[in-house]
């Protein structure tokens, strides 16, 4: 049989999430080939900022100006009451003109195909895509791409590639949070809080602390592990495959997907630029990629994360995939904000995200990896009043870092606390 795996010199897609217009622009600037976003409905991320139709249109225009695609999620598991609103929503999307829709429900897929016949359709991981028969089924219905279930190994993905049409694309999550439930189909949130994970309102009870109680001893709660804090039995580590780009390419994956439609611009920029470097280095020269793995490891650890694992890629996860004794993030840097428009020499607008002060040494995070340490020269409020520090999140500021900056640059500072509660 002809080998249908991707030639390593082919341009691969790095697909990055965005929770807002600001984060979409960050994803584009820091290396995304495509960005996936959600509207205010039907997108499985109720707590994300998400996009109004106007913001979506602006985001699509910005991305297309930079040669980047935009995919819109509509991947809820639909009930009867959702059908007519979905039709109205798709009618609105005709004006937005995204590059593809990401869908999991067959009814929504059928509606999209009828209403948006020229739109590329991708099948969400929520559809539990675990075998090549499923891929061929969706291809027969008109899907261009299928997102593989997180439960697949590298070898299983490779076998799928060899048994589907050459023009069908495989998209795979290669970085980010992992759900303890099968491809995200979780009922814990609905049962415990009344908030439906399959409608985008998950409260993440998998991250909570649990203990056991023996039925003849009501009220006596015993930790499952010998630890006074209880145990986090459902608490998965985060997926990270930056050290395994060759294996991912060899498996025939077309699109490398980053999880995180609720993440900050700092997280998105950190992960996007690290994978951009890794992919480009490998395609340029595999030896260069191998030599730079320590750099990728360093860079990918500069975002907030929950320790790393390779998930299911190299076999079924064992006990090392879980975090049993805490529910904390590792944090190397604190996000300060994104540089806005220039207002005077060396002075720029900034919406502050975390506290910093005059005289403090901070970092300008650059898309090419050549970050710059600078000292904060001055901070002013919107009226031009000098400030020594800015303790209030989302305050509109004018800052001077003693040099010219580029709008869109991300500012960050080394974190004093290396672990923070989630």
Predicted regions and their residues:
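Surface-exposed amphipathic alpha-helical tracts and adjacent flexible/coil segments at the periphery
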Residues: 2-30, 34-41, 59-60, 66-76, ...
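Glycine-rich loop at the start of a catalytic domain that most often binds anionic cofactors/ligands
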Residues: 48-53, 81-89
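Gly/Gly-Pro- and Ser/Thr-rich, intrinsically disordered tail segments characteristic of DNA damage-repair
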Residues: 84, 118-130
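Glycine-rich, positively charged N-terminal anion/phosphate-binding segment
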Residues: 45-64
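Alpha-helix capping/helix-boundary segments
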Residues: 107-108
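Short beta-strand elements of ligand-binding domains
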Residues: 72-73, 103, 123-125
């Amino acid at each position: 049989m002809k080998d249908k795996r991707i030639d390593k010199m082919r341009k691969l897609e790095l697909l990055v999430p965005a929770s807002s217009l600001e984060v979409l622009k960050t994803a584009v600037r820091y290396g995304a080939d495509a960005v996936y976003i959600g509207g205010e409905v039907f997108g499985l991320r109720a707590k994300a900022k998400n996009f109004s139709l106007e913001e979506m249109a602006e985001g699509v225009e910005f991305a297309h100006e930079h040669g980047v695609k935009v995919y819109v999620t509509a991947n809820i598991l639909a009930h009867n009451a959702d059908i007519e609103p979905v039709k109205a929503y798709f009618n609105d999307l005709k004006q937005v003109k995204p590059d593809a829709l990401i869908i999991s429900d067959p009814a929504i897929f059928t509606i999209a195909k009828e209403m948006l016949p020229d739109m590329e359709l991708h099948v969400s991981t929520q559809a539990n895509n675990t075998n090549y028969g499923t891929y061929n089924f969706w291809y027969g219905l008109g899907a261009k791409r299928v997102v593989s279930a997180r439960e697949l190994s590298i070898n299983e993905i490779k076998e799928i590639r060899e048994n589907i049409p050459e023009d069908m694309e495989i998209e795979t999550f290669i970085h980010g949070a992992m759900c303890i439930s099968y491809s995200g189909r979780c009922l814990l949130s609905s049962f415990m809080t009344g908030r439906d994970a399959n409608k985008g309102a998950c409260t993440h009870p998998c991250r909570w602390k649990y203990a056991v109680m023996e039925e003849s001893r009501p009220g006596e709660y015993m930790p499952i592990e010998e630890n006074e804090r209880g145990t986090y039995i459902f608490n998965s580590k985060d997926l990270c495959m930056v050290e395994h780009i060759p294996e991912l390419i060899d498996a025939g994956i077309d699109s490398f997907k980053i999880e995180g439609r609720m993440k900050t611009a700092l997280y998105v920029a950190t992960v996007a630029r690290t994978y951009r470097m890794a992919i480009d280095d490998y395609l340029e020269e595999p030896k260069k990629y191998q030599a730079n793995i320590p750099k990728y490891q360093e860079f990918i650890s500069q975002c907030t994360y929950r320790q790393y694992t390779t998930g299911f890629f190299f076999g079924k996860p064992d006990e090392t995939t879980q975090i049993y004794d805490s529910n904390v993030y590792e944090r190397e840097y604190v996000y300060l904000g994104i540089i806005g428009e220039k207002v005077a020499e060396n002075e720029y607008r900034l919406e502050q995200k975390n506290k910093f002060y005059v005289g403090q040494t901070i970092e300008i995070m650059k898309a090419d990896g050549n970050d710059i340490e600078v000292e904060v020269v001055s901070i002013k409020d919107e009226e031009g009043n000098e400030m020594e520090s800015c303790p209030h999140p989302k305050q509109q500021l004018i800052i001077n870092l003693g040099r010219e900056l580029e709008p869109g640059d991300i500012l960050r500072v080394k974190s004093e606390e290396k672990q923070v509660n989630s």
